[in-house]
């Protein structure tokens, strides 16, 4: 009975020993499991770090790929811009060819019109000549008929006198033959009477001679008249030739003006395009800088938030498992989240304010454009008013012309007598000389104006050449900038090669990491095999524990050996982990070095940008200096030209005065010759008068002698008283006739004296006027000499100034050459910018399509984000459930023995991991919210960009319409100018005809034209200012386009970053789910183990 009890006691002891060993083995197993879990957790953390590194590498690769894609896109855009610039240049060349063809056609038509006008003018001149010749011949015929009539009358009178004398002679002869006896006594009387008859015949012959002289004088005067008429005709022909020359000059001036206007329009269009491009570039750069600043602010906020989140995570790790601290941290996070939301709202408000400011700027610019249009309309109305005024003046001039024509006809009708005709011709000659002088002065004025216009043309051509030089210098500067860009691209390529080398190093490290992971996996497999064997031994031990104690001891030893081996393997794994951590640190250091290199590259790019801006500022300063020097040069040149023009005018005036003096001298000579002729005629007339008086005295003496003879013969001839009475009666008749003739001759002589007195008075007045004109000419000559001296002094001063200006100009020319080189570079830059503009326009279209694609991608990302948020919520719910389960397990483990304290530590570590997962989930939520807000911002920015793009397109369309309208207006203006020129030619013809009596009107017209030219110059300056404003607007628009491009590229980059972040978060979520599944499986295992232990205890108690 005792032996079985002892056996039972021994068995109980053995069972107790076995239980103790079992408990020890269980503790060892738990330790090994805890160690295994630690290793698994470390392995998970290493896998996470590996994934993070892989994601970072992928992000860097994506960024590099994006950078390469951007470089490719920039190259493509550059090529597209170059193609577009080529197309634009081809269009410009085609348009220039079209303009040249139109101008050539216009010139041909104008030449044809001028030829037709010349033919018409020639026909009109020939008609006028024919009419004048007809009138001259008619006048000659009338004069000849009148002269013939006077001669016939004189001949009839002489024949009558001769007949009467013959009859008297025949009667005397009959009386003498009848009374020969009585004749002897009267023979003496007869001889005396015959002598008287001879004297009368001599006097008649003398009268005939006087008449012949008078006729000769008359013919001379008629010849002089004809000469004066021919001179008048020559003057009229000269006048017509002058009119034709004036017309030709006006036509040439109109052609030159049209050419200048066309060239100015082309230059202004090019300047508009350049300024529009520059304005666009500036606006885009401003928007880029603003967006960069905003981006920098957002990145700063993001970095601050990341730091705060890291600090919060460190605080959470330090706080451990305190729920109150978690709640406080959650509240803090919520407050920070609210702060971030407020900051985001403020940023959105700032963006809206900037958008409103941009809209206001756009509205102000539109208002300015409207004001400019109103100003142009006002100028147009002013021009129309001036046109109407000119039409009114033309109508007045035509009416005056008609009146002058009527007055001329009346004057021609009123020409009656020969003397009046002479006086009128003299007055007309004076008027024609005055008109000729006026015409010569006007001609000199027109020539000077023509010279000034030619000089202006030359100045404009020099300006065009200067602009072309500036263009070449700009092109050279653009080439230099292009070289700098190529150098930067080379440096970027070098950085890209360095990145590729870093990638290669990363790939090598990745391969090493994969090899170490494979080794780790092999160790894990060995551990799993050991665990499986332990489980097998445990099951065997549980079934055969009572029977096989010895085998259990052997197995225990083997397990201990295997545990030592596992510990050694774990130590080796730890060593490998440390080596992996070192490799990780090395990779992180390399990554930091790469980031530093990237920052250096960015800083180098920024420094290059700053250098470029400084270079642009230097170029602008040099441009300003060049413009100032050019303005000074132009001012000095203008002064020299004005002085030269004044000198030329004075020389012309001096030459004109000399010519006028020569003409006056010639006229004086002619007048002196005429005076000498008239004095000769007067002396001849006086001689004739003396001879007539002598004849009268002789006749009186003969009369007295005849009376004496008659008284002596009274006594002898009383029986013949009847006959003598009859003879006396006849003698009294002859006496009466003779006295009547003498009276007529006296009257003729008095008339001749009066006419000669009149001519002498007129000659005296002309001599007085000539003396006055000589005095005035001498005075003018003295004035001109004084003015010439002053002008020579001024010229010497001007020459000095010109010499100084040339010296300064040479100094400036050296600077200008340097500036021209820079300007050529800038011209090359402008060409590149034009090419980039063309590519940017195409790029805009591509960006529009890419924006649509990005919108679709954003919609997809929003859907994915919503799914991710839903999955995050589910994960958080799971994590909360696991947290509750873990807390229940911790309570159960507290009830268990104190030996399971290590399990509590492990559970606490798992709780910490869960908390980390919660923190990561919260971070992911915050990141998702940030991404959502950033997506909203990007959507707003994209919508704003679309609106701005639409506005830009509308403005570009409006500008294109305005340009088309301006071109149409220019074409219409060309037609109107042709019509105006034709009407102007007619007006000038009328004015030249009216300028015979209207000098003052012509001067007023010239003043009006000068005002018109001033107004046109003012208008052209206003047009230039408007064009400059348009150019600035276009430059600003180009800048905006560039900024929009950069914004779109940045949006693409941000979208890629968000996609990479989304992938990272999704990967983190997958890892958290895997960890949660692992924790659930561990909990299930613990539950099954606890159930098995409870069942075994129940079995043992039973």
Curated annotation (Swiss-Prot):
Ventricular muscle and traces levels in the atrium. Also transient expression in skeletal muscle during fetal development and regeneration following freeze injury. The keyword ATP-binding applies. Residues 1070-1102 are annotated as: Disordered. One of its GO terms (cellular component) is cytoplasm. SUPFAM superfamilies: Myosin rod fragments. It comes from the Eukaryota. Keywords: Actin-binding, ATP-binding, Coiled coil, Cytoplasm, Motor protein, Muscle protein, Myosin, Nucleotide-binding, Thick filament. Disulfide bonds: none annotated. Residues 1-1102 form a coiled coil. Its main location: cytoplasm. One of its GO terms (biological process) is atrial cardiac muscle cell development. One of its GO terms (molecular function) is microfilament motor activity. It is found in: Cytoplasm, Myofibril. Muscle contraction. The rodlike tail sequence is highly repetitive, showing cycles of a 28-residue repeat pattern composed of 4 heptapeptides, characteristic for alpha-helical coiled coils. Muscle myosin is a hexameric protein that consists of 2 heavy chain subunits (MHC), 2 alkali light chain subunits (MLC) and 2 regulatory light chain subunits (MLC-2). This is Myosin heavy chain, cardiac muscle isoform. It comes from Gallus gallus (Chicken).
């Amino acid at each position: 009975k005792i032996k079985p009890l002892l056996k039972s006691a021994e068995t109980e002891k053995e069972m107790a020993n076995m239980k103790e060993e079992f408990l020890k083995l269980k503790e060892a197993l738990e330790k090994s499991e805890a160690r295994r879990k630690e290793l698994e957790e470390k392995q998970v953390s290493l896998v996470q770090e590996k994934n993070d590194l892989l994601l970072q590498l992928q992000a860097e690769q994506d960024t590099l790929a994006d950078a390469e894609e951007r470089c490719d896109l920039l190259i493509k855009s550059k090529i597209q811009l170059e193609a577009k610039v080529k197309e634009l240049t081809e269009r410009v060349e085609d348009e220039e060819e079209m303009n040249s063809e139109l101008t050539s056609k216009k010139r041909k038509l104008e030449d044809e019109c001028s030829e037709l006008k010349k033919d018409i003018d020639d026909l009109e001149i020939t008609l006028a000549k024919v009419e004048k010749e007809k009138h001259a011949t008619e006048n000659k015929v009338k004069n000849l008929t009148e002269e013939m009539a006077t001669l016939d009358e004189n001949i009839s009178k002489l024949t009558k006198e001769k007949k009467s004398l013959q009859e008297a002679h025949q009667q005397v002869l009959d009386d003498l033959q009848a009374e020969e006896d009585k004749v002897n006594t009267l023979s003496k009387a007869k001889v005396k009477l015959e002598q008287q008859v001879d004297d009368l015949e001599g006097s008649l012959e003398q009268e005939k001679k006087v008449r012949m002289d008078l006729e000769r004088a008359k013919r001379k005067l008629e010849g002089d008249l004809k000469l004066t008429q021919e001179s008048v005709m020559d003057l009229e022909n000269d006048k017509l030739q002058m009119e034709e020359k004036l017309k030709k000059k006006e036509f040439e001036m109109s052609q030159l003006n049209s050419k200048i206007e066309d060239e100015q329009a082309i230059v202004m269009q090019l300047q508009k395009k350049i300024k529009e491009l520059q304005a666009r570039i500036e606006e885009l750069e401003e928007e880029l800088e603003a967006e960069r600043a905003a981006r920098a602010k957002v990145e700063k906020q993001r970095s601050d938030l990341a730091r705060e989140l890291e600090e919060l995570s460190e605080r959470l790790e330090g706080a451990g498992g305190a729920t109150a601290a978690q709640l406080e941290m959650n509240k803090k996070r919520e407050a920070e989240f609210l702060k971030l939301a407020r900051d985001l709202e403020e940023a959105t408000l700032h963006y809206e304010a900037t958008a409103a400011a941009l809209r206001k700027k756009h509205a102000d610019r539109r208002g300015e454009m409207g004001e400019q249009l109103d100003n142009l309309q006002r100028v147009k109305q002013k021009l129309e008013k001036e046109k109407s005024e000119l039409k009114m003046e033309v109508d007045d001039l035509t009416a005056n012309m008609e009146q002058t024509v009527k007055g001329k006809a009346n004057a021609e009708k009123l020409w009656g007598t020969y003397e009046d005709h002479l006086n009128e011709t003299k007055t007309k000659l004076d008027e024609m000389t005055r008109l000729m002088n006026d015409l010569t002065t006007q001609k000199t004025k027109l020539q000077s104006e023509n010279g000034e216009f030619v000089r202006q043309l030359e100045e404009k051509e020099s300006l065009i050449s200067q602009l072309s030089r500036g263009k070449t210098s700009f092109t050279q500067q653009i080439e230099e900038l292009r070289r700098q860009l190529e150098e930067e691209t080379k440096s970027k390529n070098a950085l890209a090669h360095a990145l590729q080398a870093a990638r290669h190093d990363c790939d090598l490290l990745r391969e090493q990491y994969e090899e170490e992971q494979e080794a780790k996996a092999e160790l894990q497999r060995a551990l799993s095999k050991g665990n499986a064997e332990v489980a097998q031994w445990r099951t065997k031990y549980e079934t055969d524990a009572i029977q096989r104690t010895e085998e259990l001891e052997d197995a225990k030893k083997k397990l201990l050996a295997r545990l030592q081996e596992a510990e050694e393997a774990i130590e080796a794994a730890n060593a490998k982990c440390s080596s992996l951590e070192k490799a990780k640190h090395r990779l992180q250091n390399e990554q930091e070095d790469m980031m530093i290199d990237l920052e250096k590259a960015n800083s180098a790019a920024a420094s290059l940008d700053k250098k470029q801006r400084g270079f642009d500022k230097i170029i602008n300063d040099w441009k300003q200096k060049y413009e100032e020097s050019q303005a000074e040069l132009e001012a000095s040149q203008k002064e020299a030209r004005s002085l030269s023009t004044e000198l030329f005018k004075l020389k012309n005036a001096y030459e004109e005065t000399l010519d006028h003096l020569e003409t006056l001298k010639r006229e004086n000579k002619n007048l002196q010759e005429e005076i000498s002729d008239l004095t000769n005629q007067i002396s001849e007339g006086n001689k004739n008068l003396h001879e007539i008086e002598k004849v009268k005295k002789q006749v009186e003496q003969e009369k007295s002698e005849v009376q004496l003879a008659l008284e002596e013969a009274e006594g002898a001839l009383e029986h013949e008283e009847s006959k003598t009475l009859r003879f006396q009666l006849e003698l009294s008749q002859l006496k009466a006739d003779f006295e009547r003739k003498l009276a007529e001759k006296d009257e003729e002589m008095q008339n001749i004296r009066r006419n000669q007195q009149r001519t002498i008075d007129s000659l005296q007045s002309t001599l007085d006027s000539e003396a006055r004109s000589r005095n005035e000419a001498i005075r003018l000559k003295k004035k001109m000499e004084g003015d010439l001296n002053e002008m020579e002094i001024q010229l010497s001063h001007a020459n000095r100034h010109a010499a100084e200006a040339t010296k300064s100009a040479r100094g400036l020319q050296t600077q200008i050459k340097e500036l021209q080189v820079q300007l050529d570079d800038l011209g090359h830059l402008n060409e590149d910018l034009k090419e980039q503009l063309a590519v940017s326009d195409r790029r805009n279209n591509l960006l529009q399509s890419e924006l649509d694609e990005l919108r679709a991608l954003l919609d997809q990302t929003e859907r994915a984000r919503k799914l991710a948020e839903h999955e995050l919520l589910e994960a958080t719910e799971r994590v909360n459930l696991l947290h509750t389960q873990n807390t229940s397990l911790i309570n159960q483990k507290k009830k268990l023995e104190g030996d399971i304290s290590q399990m509590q530590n492990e559970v606490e570590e798992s709780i910490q991991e869960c908390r980390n997962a919660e923190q990561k989930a919260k971070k992911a939520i915050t990141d998702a919210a940030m991404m959502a807000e950033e997506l909203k911002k990007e959507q707003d920015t994209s919508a704003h960009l679309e609106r701005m793009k639409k506005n830009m397109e509308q403005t570009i369309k409006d500008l294109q319409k305005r340009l088309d309208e301006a071109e149409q207006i220019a074409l219409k203006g060309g037609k109107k100018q042709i019509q105006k020129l034709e009407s102007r030619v007619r007006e000038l013809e009328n004015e030249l005809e009216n300028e015979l009596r209207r000098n003052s009107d012509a001067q007023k017209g010239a003043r009006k034209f000068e005002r018109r030219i001033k107004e046109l110059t003012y208008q052209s300056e206003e047009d230039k200012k408007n064009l400059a404003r348009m150019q600035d607007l276009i430059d600003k628009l180009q800048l905006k386009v560039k900024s929009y491009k950069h914004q779109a590229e940045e949006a693409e980059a941000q979208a890629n970053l968000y996609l990479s972040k989304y992938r990272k978060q999704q990967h983190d979520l997958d890892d958290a789910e895997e960890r949660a599944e692992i924790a659930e499986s561990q909990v299930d295992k613990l539950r099954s183990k606890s159930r098995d232990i409870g069942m075994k205890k129940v079995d043992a108690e039973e």
